[in-house]
Amino acid sequence: MIRAHRNAVIAELETRLPGAVFKSYSAAAKAPTVSRYAVVFIGRASKPRTRFTGGQWRDIYTVTVHSVGSDEDLALWVEERVALLTGVKLTVTGRNVWPVEYITGQPLNLDDDGTRPLWFTVSQFDIVSDPA
């Protein structure tokens, strides 16, 4: 189920960043001509009970998106498109997904560890998902 939610996020971001959304940095590295892109990571943040005596049906996923660019402006350009994920109601088969909530972010920073320095910023979102 976690991959279905990740894939829904990637599909939504692809509408704004065609060919520039990846599920890992290794996948992004296979597209070396891309000067700006987003990398999506997802993890289950919690599985709370919706009722005191009920089961743990609800899933809450935290999505972390790295917006990357070859310069500061390109990284921020990607981040502006990633931010539009806020409020979107994703479609995941068999689930009732609530609108995406923006949680937090990190400011623009430089990663100069590699052979080619890249600028990046980080955004985090929560996705609340109930069985349909």
What is each of the regions a protein language model found here?
Residues M1-T53, V88-N96:
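Small/polar-rich, solvent-exposed N-terminal microdomains that initiate assembly or binding
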Residues I2, L74, G114:
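Aromatic-acidic/polar surface patches that form glycan- and anion
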Residues A27, G43-K47, V68-S70, V128-A132:
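Generic structural motif
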Residues T50-Q56, D112-R116:
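Short, solvent-exposed beta-strand/turn "edge" segments of beta-rich domains on protein surfaces
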Residues G55-L74, L118-S129:
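Oligomerization/assembly interface segments of phage tail-like spikes and tubes
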Residues S70-G87:
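Mid-chain, well-packed structural core segment of small domains
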Residues L85-A132:
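Acidic-leaning, charged glycine-interspersed low-complexity segments
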